[in-house]
């Protein structure tokens, strides 16, 4: 888990360094938005999944599968959380 976090933080830093010549290019702005989205997901992924995700089959719903911090349970196909 720690290695995954380190890789993601490094990716966010690299995305933020890819600015255009003037620092305001469209590509730079897109990268900044993507980086902040990744960081927001990292921060929120540490809490419990939304209540509706507990009853869904996580393989069928990509929105819920990102909340499965311990992966999908192979028997019930529901979210396992740490």
From Swiss-Prot:
Signal peptide limits: 1-23
Propeptide residue interval(s): 24-46
Cellular compartment(s): Secreted
Stretches of the chain forming a coiled coil according to its record: none
Modified positions (4-carboxyglutamate) in chain numbering: 60, 63
Cysteines paired by S-S bonds: 53-68, 58-72, 64-79
Coarse class of the protein's main subcellular location: secreted
GO molecular function: toxin activity
Expression sites (tissue/organ): Expressed by the venom duct.
Cellular-component GO terms for this entry: extracellular region
Keywords assigned: Disulfide bond, Gamma-carboxyglutamic acid, Hydroxylation, Secreted, Signal, Toxin
Signal in keyword set: yes
Top-level taxon of origin: Eukaryota
Modified residues (4-hydroxyproline): 49-50
Family according to the record: Belongs to the Pg turripeptide superfamily.
Domain comment quoted from the record: The cysteine framework is IX (C-C-C-C-C-C).
Protein name as catalogued: Turripeptide Gsp9.1
């Amino acid at each position: 888990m720690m290695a995954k976090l380190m890789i993601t933080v490094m990716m966010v830093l690299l995305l933020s360094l890819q600015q255009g010549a003037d620092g305001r290019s469209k590509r730079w702005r897109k990268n900044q938005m993507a980086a902040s989205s990744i960081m927001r997901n990292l921060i929120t992924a540490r809490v419990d999944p939304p209540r509706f995700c507990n009853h869904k089959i996580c393989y069928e719903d990509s929105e819920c599968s990102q909340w499965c911090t311990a992966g999908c349970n192979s028997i019930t196909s529901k979210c396992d959380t740490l």
